[in-house]
Swiss-Prot record:
Residues 709-721 are annotated as: EIF4E-binding. The lineage of its organism: Eukaryota, Viridiplantae, Streptophyta, Embryophyta, Tracheophyta. Residues 978-989 have a biased composition (Acidic residues). Component of the protein complex eIF4F, which is involved in the recognition of the mRNA cap, ATP-dependent unwinding of 5'-terminal secondary structure and recruitment of mRNA to the ribosome. It comes from the Eukaryota. Residues 196-320, 337-367, 415-707, 753-795, 974-1000, 1107-1299 are annotated as: Disordered. Pfam families: MA3 (PF02847), MIF4G (PF02854). Belongs to the eukaryotic initiation factor 4G family. This is Eukaryotic translation initiation factor 4G. Keywords: Initiation factor, Protein biosynthesis, Translation regulation. GO terms for molecular function: mRNA binding; translation initiation factor activity. Residues 216-244, 274-299, 555-566, 651-671, 753-784, 990-1000, 1111-1132, 1181-1191, 1254-1267 have a biased composition (Basic and acidic residues). Residues 883-1106 form the MIF4G domain. SMART domains: MA3 (SM00544), MIF4G (SM00543).
Amino acid sequence: MMHQGQTMMYPSVAHPIPPQLGNVNLNMASQYPQQQQNKLVAPRKSSNIKITDPNTNKEVVLGRPSPNVAAQPQQVSGVATQPMVYYTNPQQTSYNQSGTYYSGTAGVVPTGSQGRFGYPATQAGQSIPFMNPSMSNTVPASHKDNIAGPAPSGQSQLIGKPQGGLHMEKPVPSVKISMPAGRSDASKFRVADHAVQHRQKDNEVISGAMVSNKPVSEKESKAPSIPEKHSKESKAPSAVEKHPTAVTQPLPIQAAKPETDAATANSPSFLTGADEKKESLPMTDSLKDNKKNATRNDTKNLPQQPQSASPAEELKGQTSVKLGDDVVGHMETKSFDSEKVDLTSKVSGLTSATSESSISPILGKSEADSTSVNAADVPAMVISSAKLSSASTGEPQAVESLGVAAVKSKEIEITHQISPESSDGKIMSDSTENESHDFTVDLAEQASLATSKPGNSDATSFVTDPQELPKECTTSVPEDHSLMNTSHNKDTQTLSASVDASDVSEVNSGTSSESTSQSTNDKDIRSSIQETGLAVSGITPGMLPVNHSVASEGQVKHADGAKDESSTEQSSAVPTGSVRPLSREKPTAELARTKSTAGRKKKRKEMLSKADAAGSSDLYNAYKGPQEQSESVATSDGADSSSTVDGTHVLPEESEREVMCEDDGKKKVEPDDWEDAADMSTPKLQSSDSGNQASAVQLPDSDMTEANGRKKYSRDFLLTFAHQYSSLPVGIRMDTVTSTLFKDLAGKSYVIDREPHPSSARGSDRPTSRGDRRGPAMDDDKWLKSGVPYSPNRDAHMDLTNGPAINYRGGPGGAHGVLRNPRGALLVGPQSNAPQVPRSGSDADRWQQKGLIPSPVTPMQVMHKAEKKYVVGKVSDEEQAKQRQLKAILNKLTPQNFDKLFEQVKEVNIDNVSTLTGVISQIFDKALMEPTFCEMYANFCSHLAGALPDFSEDNEKITFKRLLLNKCQEEFERGEREEAEADKTEEEGEIKQTKEEREEKRVKARRRMLGNIRLIGELYKKRMLTERIMHECIKKLLGNYQNPDEENIEALCKLMSTIGEMIDHPKAKEHMDAYFDRMRNLSTSQLISSRVRFLLRDSIDLRKNKWQQRRKVDGPKKIDEVHRDAAQERHAQSSRSRGPVVSSLPRRGAPSMDYGSRGSAAPLVSPGPQQRGRGFGNQDIRYEQERHQFDRTVPLPQRSVKDEAITLGPQGGLARGMSLRGQPPVSNSELPSVVDQRRILSGPNGYNSVPSTTREDTSSRIPDRFSGRIATAAQSASSSHRPASQEGRSGNKSYSEEELREKSIATIREYYSAKDEKEVALCIEELNAPSFYPSLVSLWVNDSFERKDMERELLAKLFVGLYNGGYNLLSKPQLIEGLSSVLASLEDALSDSPRAAEYLGRLLARFVVEKILVLQDVGKLIEEGGEEPGHLVQEGIAADVLGAVLEWIRTEKGDSFLKEAKTSSNLKLEDFRPQHLKRSKLDAFMLT
């Protein structure tokens, strides 16, 4: 029956239980605990445990029966704060933890107003009896987190649920250990809620032993009630609350006061069975602690603990004894003999004032006839650790404490209770009971227990030197209390308990006075142990007899404060007060941090070498059967110094013990897969922690035999003999492992977690700092081998999160260069040379774990080796090597490196016909596929013909030319043959081909034939072939006259264009005429395509033009030629920009060049006064008709030049009749175009050249073929002076209005480029049309609206110059008329140029400023302007124009000039402003 205040909640059977609830690290294991990824562990096998006497090595028979004791109700109190519920599966199986059962209780229901840790001194409580889970194993247990209330009388019980671990455990019973009450004022305990601090790791606990200060008499122990004195003291705040919210003291180790010491002599200390007056402290089977071994490497990043004070500070005024891994490494498990042990003589009271406490693990109701204990069913009991705090700082630390079960006359009540007050199971207490130092008995973690040193049989001897206790790991243990070796003999935890320095010597008083009545016989205890499932494994014999006192030793940990040290306190319950470790499991990182003094630190190499001697992995014992376990226990007989430690003798080197203890914490390796667990279920080696078991352990050959038949021993097992043997035994090969291991470890980075301030990246509960945790059957050769490649960019701590476990597990804060494989093998330095298959991801662990059972080492299969292996670039045939070399040269052949590569060809030994034929074939192949380079390849053949010698074969002279000719004939005939084959397949249909395939084949054949024809022609030009061969080729191509083949005709045209000039000579005139007559007939035939007909016509025209091609087909050029041509183009461009020079004019037939760009306004260099020519500048591109007319009137250069003058200008243009006295006319070689205008040199009129301009288009440029004659005329021109008379002007020539418009536009555009007013004046004079001048002004002004401001400024300047610049070409009436025309079309111009009114106003203002017009004239023009008079005023355009005029005048001349102009003009601005306009530019000028 569960008390209501506990607020327990029970989930349904099918409720999925998460592995961890919230931030609390305490929870119950689910029925099937959730496994971490790649962390699957098979259930452990059970094994029987024999309890033997260490002196006689005989089995101890515990035959005293344990009467049934009725369950006593327990009053529960707590704090009604935030409840924390821990779930467990109600179904008890082999995978979950057994539940805790409570009887009905009566107490005060907790309220929210109660204090979090309210423990009234007057409260009395009752112990919770143990209920056999085997009888009622269906009731789950849950606990609330924060419950406080009246504490039980004189006792504190700590009830909690172990955390549901990820690895599978057998169900274990609850253990209740009662402890006598002591004085309430013995020591003041501080209460600290460590849950609000950093979370403690759930598997690291430090236990402190709650020791009673007063001896207990046998009579009192049997009494049903506690004496009055003790009853009063029981009302004091108890050390540990029964409820999970109960807390205990942080164990500040203080020296007991004198009055406390005095009181301890009279304090009753007894262990009763079930009465309410006994002082009990529950003990738990902490699955959380048991999980330490399995989850040291689990990927759980937990917060770090705050660092506590140094050990020196903690040891001030106190004495602590460290017990655990430091001792376990040197302790040897012992077996009991079969003889019975009188437990009555070995009962001791809890007399130590500080660290002495009696643990009476009394078995509850069970079947008394059971005679064996299954070690796998119930893990070992471990005394839960208490969180030690620094005495200097006084910080309260959470303590996970378990009470001492009460014992009453042959009954053992075991209660499995733990308090989850803190997030990780650390329990805090505010009790002031000095004798209530609590400690935890872990039923799941004990593996290897050390026995007492033989010879120490003094039942009353205690540790008397309080100063020696902190230094030593262990104290002496009596012989008659041995430890049992179980499957977890290596994974035990250290015990830590505070010892009062002043009360250590008082332990020997009254320890065994009350022990007789409470002890049970051997047989009954054994049967009870089996029935209740109590794991005797890891339990000292002192825990089985009644009232065995414990001199708990605990070395103050937290030297660096990084973590809670997982040390538990052993209650050996011996009269001598000796202390035994119950567990050995301790992380290496924790052990390293306990070494705060420099004297304890040794060299790295020494520590590593000694750490390996601590023993083999616990996986051997984890999967042993009962028989194997018994054998292991039997063979662990005979303790020596390495395993049995006498408390009175300090080991020679404490660092050696620490290193060996450190190694123990790393032996445990959990398989990552269920397959691996199955593989590991068969043990390969049976090892022990004993250092001298070489002679005792006899392993069967099957366990040590490799697949190859040789015996193989694990490295850990062999290192157990390090203390006895200095050399290896004969027949064992360790040279490879030893040299590899110690060489790498000594000289390279090796991760040892010894830093005093660990990094925050430390997240694993058991740091993987050492590489010793390997599978039991791990092959030594493969220890350092890893199939997982190391990635330098990979985070070594990436698998320390809650995500999937990756193979890389770096040491916490250690060197990142050291990684470890899934089995813990250390990856140091270069990895194995053996071929590895790199794997990553979730399958990596599974693949790597397959090697737990070593596989036979087989040599790698040798690949087949060819007799003649292939070597890249190596050619066995010499001829083939030559051909490859020649092909490489041809591939790099260019006109630029022609000479150099030809020298390389000559270096190739071409000494036979075969090589020469191959060279010719390669040249033809390159030429046919690259027709552009046929000329170069022909040149190459010409050079080869002269360089290569003649060869003789079969008395026949063979030359390069002969072979070349044969190749040409072969290729020529090949083309015909391919065409015939194509026709044949098409006609007969022997090979069915699609149309696309036939077309592709024809194209390929035609391309090859054309290349061949062109190469033949180029070879003929190099005189490599004869003329007769060329005629034969032509006849062949023209042979089929009636049904011509287009490919042949195309090849003929190509051949004619190549060799026509050479073959067309007088001797071959008849043949050539016949050829071209036939070609002329074919050009008009409709049987061939138009493309081929035009090819024929081009060939005919080419012969008429004396084989002068219209455009030169440029072939490959040298780099120098390319640079030279580019320089010539640049030079020609610059010459055209300045004006043509005689030497730079292109000759007839030269390619035309365009240098103009649209919109270019770059000024051209104005020619000198003696370089001005006459003409009208540029011709607009828009007037194509005039250009065509000009082309028709220009005679061709080859025509005979008659005596009459030749007009080079357009017909009817101004150039006609402009020659002086019948001399050759002056003309423009090229009419000005919009883009590229050239002012060509004039004739005998005295002007050498005219400037050229760049215009907007190139299409209207006159062909360059006219420049030749102009250059001739320019050479005879005189450059003396400008003639004085104007007789040269032709008054008879007149132009149409359209022509005048064109010329005027061309002139102004030329002016914008050249900026030469005189040239414009000359052009206007040439026009000789004064009536056209108003139109010219209108055209120029309208054109300026789309120009830039600079060009508009040039136009205004030009008008001023033409009006009063000495030219007198424009008059005022002409100017006003032109401006009126502009105003008439201004409204339309505004649609194209919105700022046209402003531009016009600026021009008019310029006329006013230059005094060409007065402001009154301007006003009149604006007022009367428009399509109709006054229209601009109505539209508001007049106001904009006049406002722009006035604005510009004021800007340029100032207000005074503007005012004077306004005054003189009598202009009324109001007349120009329409009434409907709200705002106008005139508004600013109307006010002044």
